[in-house]
Amino acid sequence: QMGLAENQLTSDLVEDWILNNPEASICTPEGINDFRAIANFQDYHGLAEFRNAVAKFMARTRGNRITFDPDRIVMSGGATGAHEVTAFCLADPGEAFLVPIPYYPGFDRDLRWRTGVKLVPVMCDSSNNFVLTKEALEDAYEKAREDNIRVKGLLITNPSNPLGTIMDRKTLRTVVSFINEKRIHLVCDEIYAATVFSQPGFISIAEILEDETDIECDRNLVHIVYSLSKDMGFPGFRVGIIYSYNDAVVNCARKMSSFGLVSTQTQYLLASMLNDDEFVERFLAESAKRLAQRFRVFTGGLAKVGIKCLQSNAGLFVWMDLRQLLKKPTFDSETELWKVIIHEVKINVSPGYSFHCTEPGWFRVCFA
């Protein structure tokens, strides 16, 4: 199974922590005394200690170069729920978000299915290693206007899924300047923030807001979606985070989050874990070390048989280039090759067309 972006490399560290901290769970003899308090109705905005712990963890995964206000954190059922709530808050049916391609296929579900919002692709290709440019943003924006589609925002994923790359400071400055010029919102999916395993390091959009004082930036237009699914390896816990600099969005998202709450038991356990500074420090360091080692082994093995990947340093996957194996440079040929990999090689990988890539022959392969 190399088609799911799961981080299973550090499960043992979490298991050891739970064994050594049984009082963190209300389902153990050591924690049972708190059962009634936790099992009853709680603040729908989330436990204060959990929001504080998440704010501290978000700062830690960004090198403690910035801080986050716990009162601006809104809980949701995973990043899926967080994205949908954000879309409901920012756009009406028929309005659109620009999204650089290739992008995570789940965005088509998260942002479109129930909201009626459209996604307009921003063209990025291998000629410059899929780097987002001002020209591509302008082209997508103008194309939407020509089609009578009102653009309400830009959605970026940093680090990128499926590319495994990070956006540098120059690109992030371009993004901020663009959304301010167009007066549209910016939604930054940063759920892979702590999966960077080599230099250059991750730069959060929050850092741009703090540091780049020479460019115009209306904070009311900026929103971050985060999760513990990838950085901590907890996709089953369904912990999604919306962090908005816009008071109206925070208030609206809080009301909507009532339909997708994070269980209090989960909050209680994770608050204790994330407040263990020694564990978090050790966990993040070991996670980066293991991701780097797995990345080197996997890409090294591919290189030995002549298969290249896009140069990357983050995420739980590589963007594998199999264009030379296509019978023809078409998506039909890509599908044919994908079926061979699935049915004959017996490996589940994801074809590039599922990420809306415009170039046949690219595949996402998860290695963690």
Swiss-Prot record:
Its cofactor is pyridoxal 5'-phosphate. PROSITE patterns: AA_TRANSFER_CLASS_1. GO terms for molecular function: 1-aminocyclopropane-1-carboxylate synthase activity; pyridoxal phosphate binding; transaminase activity. Induction: Hormones, such as auxin, environmental factors, such as mechanical wounding and a number of chemicals. InterPro entries: Aminotransferase_I/II_large, Ethylene_sulfur-biosynth, NHTrfase_class1_PyrdxlP-BS, PyrdxlP-dep_Trfase, PyrdxlP-dep_Trfase_major, PyrdxlP-dep_Trfase_small. Keywords: Ethylene biosynthesis, Fruit ripening, Lyase, Pyridoxal phosphate, S-adenosyl-L-methionine. This is 1-aminocyclopropane-1-carboxylate synthase. It comes from Vigna radiata var. radiata. The gene is ACS5.
